[in-house]
């Protein structure tokens, strides 16, 4: 889902960068008001490292294209949506520098899709279903976060004029539907394990709006 440099017109890329900076500034402000700020920062650093490491792991898929887990929905469920945006921003810089994924001019657009849209979609779908069932809320938050990010990327690419709606829907949507299911199931196991092993990590203060 990482968009490379040169795909999006610079004036559009600048808008996505500005939006990213606004949300990151909001994150820093909210973080300064959060209880257990030190614990939040430590856990954010740990999950940022995990997210970066996970991006280098390829999982075979029936589509012939390997899956790279996002991990951002996991970060959001544990630390809140603004933390998800911050982790996405840090990881995308590291992924570009060390793995050649994404780009610099396209970084803002990537953060908008996989950081902002994915984080807030995950958070609110997770919260909306939390009263029904814990596993359902984890799965639905993860799955819908990935699907909404996919839709956001389709919109960004349509605005950039690089592909038709038919092509984007036929290539991106089926693949990320599959990714959403896989990562949703994985997150159920991870969070259930963390709740038993380190419940304080699951119950830590969230950085959100």
Q: What residue ranges belong to the model's regions?
A:
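Juxtamembrane/transmembrane-helix interface segments of polytopic membrane transporters
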Residues: 149, 153-161, 191, 195
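C-terminal transmembrane helix-loop-helix hairpin of multi-pass membrane proteins
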Residues: 136-146, 165-209
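Hydrophobic cores of alpha-helical transmembrane segments in multi-pass inner/ER membrane proteins
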Residues: 16-23, 115-125, 181-193
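Hydrophobic transmembrane alpha-helices
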Residues: 2-74
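Hydrophobic alpha-helical transmembrane segments
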Residues: 41-46, 85-89, 112, 135-143, ...
């Amino acid at each position: 889902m990482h968009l490379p440099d040169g795909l999006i017109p610079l004036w559009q890329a600048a808008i996505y960068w500005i939006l990213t900076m606004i949300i990151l500034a909001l994150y820093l402000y909210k973080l300064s008001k959060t209880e257990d700020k030190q614990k939040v920062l430590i856990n954010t650093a740990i999950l940022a490292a995990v997210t970066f490491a996970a991006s280098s792991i390829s999982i075979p898929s029936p589509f012939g294209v390997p899956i790279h887990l996002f991990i951002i929905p996991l970060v959001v469920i544990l630390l809140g949506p603004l933390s998800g945006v911050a982790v996405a921003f840090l990881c995308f810089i590291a992924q570009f520098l060390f793995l050649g994924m994404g780009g610099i001019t396209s970084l803002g657009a990537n953060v908008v899709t996989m950081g902002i849209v994915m984080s807030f979609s995950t958070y609110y779908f997770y919260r909306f279903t939390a009263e029904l069932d814990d596993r359902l809320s984890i799965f639905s938050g993860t799955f819908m976060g990935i699907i909404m990010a996919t839709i956001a990327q389709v919109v960004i690419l349509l605005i950039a004029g690089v592909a038709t709606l038919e092509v984007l829907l036929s290539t991106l949507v089926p693949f990320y539907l599959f990714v959403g299911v896989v990562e949703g199931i994985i997150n159920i196991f991870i969070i259930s394990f963390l709740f038993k092993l380190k419940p304080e990590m699951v119950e830590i203060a969230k950085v959100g709006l």
